[in-house]
Regions:
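Short glycine-/small-residue motifs
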Residues: 121-124
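Vicinal oxygen chelate
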Residues: 1-6, 28-115, 126-130
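Alpha-helical macromolecular-interaction surfaces
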Residues: 16-17, 86
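Onset of an N-terminal alpha helix
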Residues: 5, 12-15
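Conserved active-site tyrosine of GNAT-family acetyltransferases
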Residues: 18-23, 91, 119
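Short, surface-exposed ligand-recognition loops at beta-strand->loop->(often short) alpha-helix junctions
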Residues: 10-13, 80
Length: 130
């Protein structure tokens, strides 16, 4: 069996706060989606889905938020090292939690990590040679 990945899904506490964060990263999410229990965003061949905790519990009564660390991270290509720094400043300046300030990695990238409103790590990166 060979399956094709199609959707990455995030379970969120506060849909409006989460969507505001991902809009700040440049995702095209309609403003009227803030009160929806489920939102899909096209990512050029894949989709990013957001479901509220209540939506998941409506069909999986045993569902509970993860504890003790994250189970998924998203990574955004910022194209240039300067854009990594600019994205970090913009997001942390907007009040989002900065987890790891921008640094140059040993694998040749400029890298930073911020948390979305649910604590999901969002990596910001660019090749140093860009």
């Amino acid at each position: 069996m060979k399956l094709r990945p199609a959707v990455v899904e995030l379970v969120v506490r506060d849909m409006a706060a989460t969507l505001a964060f991902y809009r700040q990263l440049g995702l095209d999410i309609p403003a009227d989606a803030d009160n929806e229990p489920h939102v899909d965003v096209e990512l050029g061949g894949m989709r990013l889905a957001f479901d509220t905790e209540d939506t998941i519990r409506s069909f999986d009564t045993k569902s509970s938020p993860p504890t003790g660390g994250h189970r998924v991270a998203l990574a955004f290509d910022c194209v240039t090292p300067e854009q990594v720094d600019a994205a970090w400043v913009e997001l942390t300046g907007a009040g989002y939690e900065g987890h790891l300030a921008p640094w140059d990695t040993f694998w040749g990238m400029r890298y930073a990590v911020v948390h979305d409103p649910d604590g999901t790590p969002v990596d910001l990166f660019a090749l140093l040679s860009a």
